[in-house]
Amino acid sequence: MPIHRGQEAWSLLLNGLYSIEFSAGPDKPRGSGVVVLCDGILLGGDSSLFYKGTYSQRDGKFEATVRTSRHSHHTPSLFGLDEATLSFTGTIIRGDARGFGASSQLDIKLEVHLRFRTQIA
């Protein structure tokens, strides 16, 4: 359960561990993984890719730029590429985040949902 102090925290992404779910549409493949957000840096991954990027937040909104790179060839990538750069924008709701993303390398739009799991220092 998230630790929130005051109403302002409900519209912030706290430094912490988040689960991430993403999809390219209702009848399209879905993916999931984990990310750590800490002071504007985003790090994470799933069974085939690792993620590295930056994020910013203001007035209950967030923006992120993420580069994905393959670490395992045992599981296919949802994106179909070994490396891609994605940009996301969205809204922070009760400490979690929902938004949309795209990449000039991919002809897809992604829906993304970050769920806060635990705080880090």
Question: Which role does the model predict for each range below?
Answer:
Residues 2-6, 32, 54-59, 96-121:
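Edge beta-strand at a domain terminus
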Residues 29, 36-38, 47-49, 82-86, ...:
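Residues that act as N-cap/strand-start positions at coil-to-secondary-structure junctions
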Residues 13-17, 34-42, 58-61, 90-96, ...:
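Short, solvent-exposed coil/turn segments at beta-strand boundaries
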